[in-house]
């Protein structure tokens, strides 16, 4: 049985999802970048509802919008940068991802979300494995809708 090779993509977008940049295949366009995992990608944020408690009643008034709106969720994206040019690739990826809004999707889940980078970016570990040096970096991404959607090809 052949091993399944998943692909991981990002694209610069406006907040409404309109593309403003080229699609980047992360492991092709950033030579030496290796995807590890995206923790929290399947999480759904808390639904926003309005509740009103009235002193004279044991009932509670609740307003639930027809179109659900969710709190933003955080996704931890863990990447490795390997090889001789690992710092160049790390810096090029940071230049790409740290400004504005970016859409992420992959061929494993076929789900997409729009995010911005919230917290500082720093190298978790600089490790040497055999003769191939690599950097491990965790990125904290804020999913602006609080959920993922089916990727539209």
Regions found by a protein language model. Give the residues of each.
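Extracellular/virion structural assembly segments
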Residues: 2-153
């Amino acid at each position: 049985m052949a091993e399944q090779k998943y692909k991981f993509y990002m694209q610069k977008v406006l907040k409404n999802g309109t593309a403003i940049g080229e699609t980047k295949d992360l492991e092709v366009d950033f030579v030496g970048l290796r995807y590890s995992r995206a923790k929290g990608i399947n999480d759904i944020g808390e639904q926003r509802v309005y509740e009103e408690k009235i002193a004279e009643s044991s009932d509670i008034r609740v307003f639930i919008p027809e179109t659900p709106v969710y709190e933003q969720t955080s996704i931890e994206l863990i990447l490795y940068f390997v090889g001789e040019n690992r710092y160049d690739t790390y810096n090029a990826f940071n230049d790409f991802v740290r400004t504005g809004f970016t859409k992420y999707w992959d061929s494993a889940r076929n789900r997409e979300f729009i995010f911005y980078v919230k917290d500082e970016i720093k190298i978790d570990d600089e490790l040497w494995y055999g003769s191939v040096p690599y950097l491990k970096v965790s990125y904290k991404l804020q999913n602006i809708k609080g959920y993922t959607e089916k990727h539209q090809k």
